[in-house]
A protein has these predicted regions:
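Outer membrane beta-barrel
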Residues: 93-130, 134-269, 286-301, 306, ...
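Bacterial N-terminal signal peptides
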Residues: 35-45
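Sequence/structural signature of outer-membrane beta-barrel proteins
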Residues: 115, 176-182, 212-218, 229-231, ...
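N-terminal secretory signal peptides that target proteins for export/translocation
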Residues: 1-30
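Detector for outer-membrane/organellar transmembrane beta-barrel domains
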Residues: 285, 292, 297-409, 413
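N-terminal periplasmic/intermembrane-space "pro-region" immediately following the signal or transit peptide
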Residues: 51-123, 136
Length: 458
């Protein structure tokens, strides 16, 4: 047995590839007998020690087996649940022809509304109308109704490694495109494109092509009562979505400054014919809209803020064939005061701004063909004490020069308060009260608007 043990010890040393030095060999020669003796004693003592130990009780082994079985069962259940979730996710995804994953999103929204005076639009009023029409007929003084035409739907895609950056694209549509003359009227609304964007983002810039909000006025108030037309339109909010090519270059400073520029399609904002459309007065200028903006951002996620200063310039052809300049200077901001309180808003000054969405209370040129000078703005405070509940209030005003519109709308002030709850499962409920006050040469007209919204998001 001793020979066998020593032989195995020598084989182990060779397998480990040890190459002892002369000094090490000398020391090993003197210590090898003692080491072998100790190893032999340990080998002989091990069986005795093992026999001296009492075997584990059968009950303890059974408990250990039951515990292992329970943990194995829970692991199998978790794996099965994960498989079901992955299968459901794969089934819910939309596979496009280009094999790019597309995500559907949207909001089904029912709005019940009440007005106590004549307004320009029943479910989303922008200003108060005069009690009588220009021909002298009495207007209906308020009413009660409901609609689902602020329902919206969209699709989004994202692809990595496109032109050295990341590509994001989306299409957003709603049913606020008006209605065909029919028995159903507002209950059978027309589909309308809101935004359609393709964006390539790099580390220090991005390029956008498609239909988007004006570069200089890219902030809207929070509301589930005024979605088809953003809140405070014709009362300080410039919003009209338009086709454009937009670029952003980050300057890499501590203030996270960025320079933005856009070339947009010209428009006066005038109503178009139902089917065949012609060029409007802005398109007749044969010049695009030019916009430039300098912005600064700070914070992340719930505490991210932004402030920007932008300039807008466009052209409109007047009745005598001359070109009238549309221009504006706009300051917009989203400022998180705390993690649950945010202040947002815009202020502007300019002229001939109907093409940006409600500027000049929808009045572009004077009777003499001169631009309507205008100034306005809005601000809203929004509080979100819980992830499922938020409330807030704000006001907006548009104030054209009285001498430019002596027979038109001289001033429009809108104040609104809202509360929105999302109890879970995508369900949402919102309540908004809005007071509108529009001033004419004959005096102010007022309307109280109450809107109850209910629906779900997906």
């Amino acid at each position: 047995m001793m020979r066998t043990f020593l032989s195995r010890a020598r084989d182990t040393g060779r397998d480990q590839g040890s190459v002892p030095t002369a000094a090490a060999t000398s020391r090993t020669g003197r210590t090898r007998p003692a080491a072998c003796a100790l190893a032999l004693a340990a080998a002989l003592a091990a069986p005795a020690a093992a026999r001296a130990q009492d075997p584990a009780p059968d009950s303890l082994r059974a408990a250990e087996l039951d515990s292992l079985r329970e943990r194995l069962r829970r692991a199998e259940d978790a794996i099965e649940l994960l498989r079901e979730q992955l299968a459901a996710q794969a089934a819910s995804g939309v596979q496009t022809r280009t094999r790019v994953r597309a995500d559907l999103f949207g909001r089904v929204l029912t709005n019940a509304f009440y007005n106590d005076a004549a307004v320009n639009n029943a479910d989303v009023p922008l200003f108060v109308a005069t009690p009588t029409t220009p021909s002298g007929e009495e207007r209906p003084q308020g009413g009660l109704g409901a609609s689902v035409r602020q329902t919206s739907v969209g699709v989004a895609v994202s692809v990595s490694h496109v032109l050295g950056g990341d590509f994001l694209g989306d299409l957003q549509a709603d049913f606020f495109g008006g209605q065909q003359p029919s028995t159903g009227g507002r209950n059978f609304p027309l589909l309308r494109v809101r935004k359609a964007r393709g964006i390539v983002r790099w580390a220090r810039g991005e390029l956008l092509a498609g239909q988007e909000s004006p570069l200089v006025a890219d902030v809207d108030p929070v509301s589930v009562a005024s979605v088809g037309t953003p809140g405070f339109t014709a009362a300080g909010n410039l919003w009209l979505w338009a086709p454009q090519l937009r670029g952003t270059l980050q300057l890499g400073t501590r203030a996270r400054l960025a320079v933005q520029g856009a070339v947009a399609a010209p428009t006066t904002g005038d109503p178009a014919a139902p089917f065949d459309t012609d060029v409007d007065a802005a398109e007749q200028s044969k010049r695009p809209v030019l916009q430039l903006r300098l912005r600064s951002r700070w914070g992340e996620d719930d505490t991210r803020g932004e402030i920007g200063v932008g300039a807008h310039r466009g052209w409109v052809r007047s009745a005598d064939g001359s070109l009238v300049t549309s221009e504006a200077l706009v300051v917009s901001a989203e400022v998180p005061l705390t993690r649950v309180v945010e202040l947002r808003g815009e202020v502007y000054t300019g002229q001939a701004l109907r093409g940006l969405g409600g500027g000049g209370i929808g009045q572009n040129l004077t009777a003499a063909g001169e631009p309507v000078r205008d100034r306005g703005g809005w601000a809203q405070l929004d509080v979100r004490p819980r992830s499922y509940f938020q409330f807030g209030a704000g006001c907006g005003v548009a104030d054209p020069e009285d001498e430019d519109v002596p027979a038109g709308r001289l001033r429009n002030v809108v104040c609104a308060a809202h509360a929105i709850a999302r109890p879970g499962g995508g369900v949402l409920v919102g309540l908004e009260f809005r007071r509108l006050r529009t001033t004419y040469a004959a005096g102010p007209e007022e309307n109280d608007h109450l809107n109850l919204a209910a629906g779900f998001e997906f």
